[in-house]
């Protein structure tokens, strides 16, 4: 498997960007530090999925020897640590915050809650991790006649119980078979041409647990996923064939020349029913440049593909592009640039950042669900960048002074879509700021905008922290149109992370 597999999954990413999932109006746990566990588990987060830690090894992220100020450690200064499997750890956390849900544009009423959020994390090393916990929102005011003590929208369906499992990992990136269960944020399915930057909790009243199964057998690599393990929603997978392996035997660098086929079906059940949709895509990828020197690597790849909507005549699309991945001890950079063609209502990245809202009501003035809304034929240019940087040594999740993920698509008929997330660590990692923005249908009537942010400040040796959050939301309604809202939260948390 080569570095160029841009897609893979990021089920654990919401834990890096707390509160940045639109559906999770209020934060997931964020950064703490070590309890004799690897840095990637220090804040209740588990080691990230392949999209965040691909086969190119950077080495262990923690226990770095002191380095003179202003100078990153040289490769030969980086420590050699015992296997992660030998370093079990745990984390306990409790957050207590006030939460206010506010109406926007004169629609709805405000509600107030006391929010309690316990968290338990068990880190079993490279092949096992578990993060459990859920928010309990106790009503202080609002909600209308008959409103209960606990906010019922958080627990009114079987799928909502999936929020108890924030992250479960069985197997490592290099295992023949591996399973991840939890929240999906910014998820790509391998090539990313069908499932691209998808988040399964964009709907603020829907809290499912998704799952990703990864398997490798000879020249075959497979990813199968479900957006909701307790409900009939998005299901599908992508099968990738290593052509060089088939023709010439096992290569020294697997995954340089591949063909892949993906298919996705939305059963449309979930908390709110919607139309069923099926899409398929065929892709070819070639890695044209590979440079490796010690713990530094650079890869460039080109790709092309064609997709369609089975059963819908004339619905097809084509794509071609180039990508680059670069990894050093302090930087992980991934770039992608694509030219796309859409025809008959098909588009690449159909299951994207906005999908859980768009399946109910697409951006624009039609008011129709995405499956029934018209999409003009034309061309587009898509660009995506993922940057992780640390001044000392890049860790898997927590040890990152900067984490940026952004995708943008501009269409020939005027529309522009942008999705981005940014998180920074300041003041010896005691201050953290995270923001997220989503804009769909810009430069067109009925454009959709969402934004949220969070600030966390650790003090008293890092065990106690203050946090504040705020942002905008869109709620589904029985009448059909999405209802705009906003939230604000302020509180404290304590854990044994330092």
Where are these regions (language model features)?
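Bacterial N-terminal signal peptides that target proteins for export
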Residues: 1-10
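Bacterial N-terminal signal peptides
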Residues: 9-18
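N-terminal periplasmic/intermembrane-space "pro-region" immediately following the signal or transit peptide
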Residues: 24-108, 117-129
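N-terminal low-complexity, acidic/Ser/Thr/Gly/Pro-rich segments
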Residues: 79-99, 111-115, 119-121, 129, ...
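Signature for the C-terminal beta-barrel architecture of outer-membrane proteins
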Residues: 87-91, 109, 143-144, 176-178, ...
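Surface-exposed loop and membrane-interface regions of Gram-negative outer-membrane beta-barrel proteins
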Residues: 108-110, 124-167, 194
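Long alpha-helical, hydrophobic tracts
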Residues: 150-202, 209-210
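C-terminal structured domain segments
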Residues: 432-477
